[in-house]
Amino acid sequence: MSDADVDAESNPYLRDPPTEFEPAESLSREAAEGQAALLREAVREHDHRYYVAADPLVSDAAYDALFSRLVALEDAFDLDTTNSPTNRVGGEPIDALETVEHVAPMLSIDQSTDADDLREFDERVRREVGAVDYVCEPKFDGLSVEVVYEDGEFVRAATRGDGRRGDDVSAQVKTIPTVPLSLRGDHPDRLAVRGEIYMPKSDFSDLNARRVEAGEDAFANPRNAAAGTLRNLDPSVVADRPLAVFFYDILDASARPDSQWAALDRLREWGLRVTDRIERAEDVAEAIDYRDRMQAARDDLDYEIDGTVIKVDSRDARERLGEKSRSVRWAFAYKFPARHEVTTVRDIVVQVGRTGRLTPVAILDPVDVGGVTVSRATLHNPDERAALGVAVGDRVRVKRAGDVIPQVVEVTEDGGGCYEFPDECPVCGSAVDRDGPLAFCSGGLSCPAQREASIGHFAVKGAMDIDGLGEERVAQLVDAGLVETVADLYDLTADDLAELEGWGETSAENLVAAVENAKHPSLDSFLVGLSIPEVGEATARGLAREFGSIEAFPIEADAEEDEFDAFEERLTTVPDVGETVARRVRDFFENADNRAVIRALLDRGVDPEPVESGGDELDGLTFVVTGTLAASRSDVTELVESHGGNVTGSVSGNTDYLVVGENPGRSKRDDAEANDVPTLAETEFEALLAERGVAYPPE
């Protein structure tokens, strides 16, 4: 018997179920499979009633008895438990989170705290598609995920990531009670939905109390707790923490409802949890009123929200409005203003970032700001601090920018103190360099603060991608004296690591292997890993294309001034590298300690792959892509750039072609029309590349 054959109405484990059973071993396999199928159906129904409908049918004790019986049957007869509710207790730890492509793009939403911006959004919508109704929803302050079902069964879950790709967190999400492993009712064959994973505020307080009692650090806020939990590699840890989810959008389905309101009804019918704080609005005034009422009620909710989302209800109108490259044009997030509280400044310290940037930070009397205890707040930069006039002893108004980052807004009462920004780095004593309003430590990688932060950054995805080397482990390696610079990572042995607290033979060997596997990065990834100021992934790709190999950079110990002059001049020819960025990159390479670290990496066998140009077949051509293509956006960019072309994010008079894939955004097409830029369907794009000897899609 399969679970699908079970008739819920005749299931004996739904109402007044037995709590005692004969030994599992006394059943035949056929009888055990039949009873297990009934129990799975019953446990799923009880989960739905308890977590989603808030209308339980049985007592906790009865539920526990049914659950235990199901576990006993599955264990005794080695039954298939792929999507059994018993899987929620968590499985074996995994080595790392893998990146997966989303079924459909998870685009962002334009946002503002200003009602006039919402009114402008409404005017544009009505101008383009006429009168519409809106659906108003809370803007949950959690972690957005895509959950995929096939034939009604849970298949996969992934974080939002960059909107196109995210981390596979299937093992973690399966443990969350409010995520059904099997859909209810007349569900579509294929379904991808979007939801927000969060930690209830009441459970967050209890979790933090337990962590403090156990000698562990408390989480800063429920969102951090949810995000940290979901990315934990051990599903049993996730299962032990109180995560929950609200679903609010259908990303892809074999049959899609014709409105958002209908989509929410379908989600409920399929057993997917939807908040009851959703309303319709006939005009923008009603949407503003909804937001004001939600702001007044936010403290009474058991989940964090930071605003409301206003969505065009009609799917037809949505399709006509289209999308931008990163956000939809049919929804708007009307956010709450940041919360403010007044407290006293007890000290001002200077924080040193991984690129050497010095940031003044106010140490405060602890104050509760929106449910989070704030004891530190950024002052941004020396000029901002001076403009605010903040000094020790002042009473200041503090807010959480975006309800996340604490910052000082103003001085409300002068405490009579004074403060001067240091002219030396507080960590290493090197001179402070000023660049406009910003201040930087000139010590480079010889500065311990920059060194430790740069080691952690060296290992991240997009740089050297060293699995298992997070911030805590980096701090442990530095504290133990095993690592002073990133080059020292390549001297580590399993014996060194196995002696450290919390390490075993397997984890030590895994890290050594991961470091060894990171000896042949692409040149742009290597440059990202060096923590060069102003150099992110896009700029690193440009530098890699321009210079071709690491040896083309001035990295020798005896590099002279004229070499750096020529280097800086060449930098300004790289797309999107202006004079300021060129100067910051020059400063990095002009620092002898930084060059020594690069040479030490090369001496230890790190060999960044030279950029081998695929030719100049696309030289001088600039493309913009909208919609979904057969190849990922990053693969298209890499292909075009390797053959001398350029891919940008927006259409202008300098664009040669707009490549249009599936579900394209309207704004780029409008911009292309306004600038007389030709558009290419994907097949036409493929033909154009083929004419120039470039194969597409890339292998």
From Swiss-Prot:
Reported regulation of activity: Displays maximal in vitro activity at high salt levels.
GO function term, MF aspect, one: metal ion binding
Renumbered residue ranges of the record's region Disordered: 1-29
GO-annotated cellular components: cytosol
Record: residues binding NAD(+): D60, A61, A62, Y63, D64, S108, I109, E137, R160, E196, K311, K335
Changes seen on gene knockout: Deletion of both ligA and ligN is lethal.
Binding-site residues, Zn(2+): C425, C428, C441, C447
Catalytic activity: NAD(+) + (deoxyribonucleotide)n-3'-hydroxyl + 5'-phospho-(deoxyribonucleotide)m = (deoxyribonucleotide)n+m + AMP + beta-nicotinamide D-nucleotide
Gene3D superfamilies: 5' to 3' exonuclease, C-terminal subdomain, BRCT domain, DNA ligase/mRNA capping enzyme, Helix hairpin bin, Nucleic acid-binding proteins
The organism's place on the tree of life at top rank: Archaea
This enzyme's EC code(s): 6.5.1.2
Sequence ranges assigned to domain BRCT in this UniProt record: 613-666
Residues annotated as the enzyme's active site: K139
Cofactor(s) it depends on: Mg(2+); Mn(2+)
GO biological process, alphabetically ordered: DNA repair; DNA replication
UniProt KW keywords: DNA damage, DNA repair, DNA replication, Ligase, Magnesium, Manganese, Metal-binding, NAD, Zinc
Result of changing K139A: Lack of activity
NCBIfam families: dnlj, PRK07956.1, PRK14351.1
Role noted for this protein: DNA ligase that catalyzes the formation of phosphodiester linkages between 5'-phosphoryl and 3'-hydroxyl groups in double-stranded DNA using NAD as a coenzyme and as the energy source for the reaction. It is essential for DNA replication and repair of damaged DNA.
Family label: Belongs to the NAD-dependent DNA ligase family. LigA subfamily.
The name this protein goes by in its record: DNA ligase
Provenance organism: Haloferax volcanii (strain ATCC 29605 / DSM 3757 / JCM 8879 / NBRC 14742 / NCIMB 2012 / VKM B-1768 / DS2) (Halobacterium volcanii)
Lineage of source species: Archaea, Methanobacteriati, Methanobacteriota, Stenosarchaea group, Halobacteria
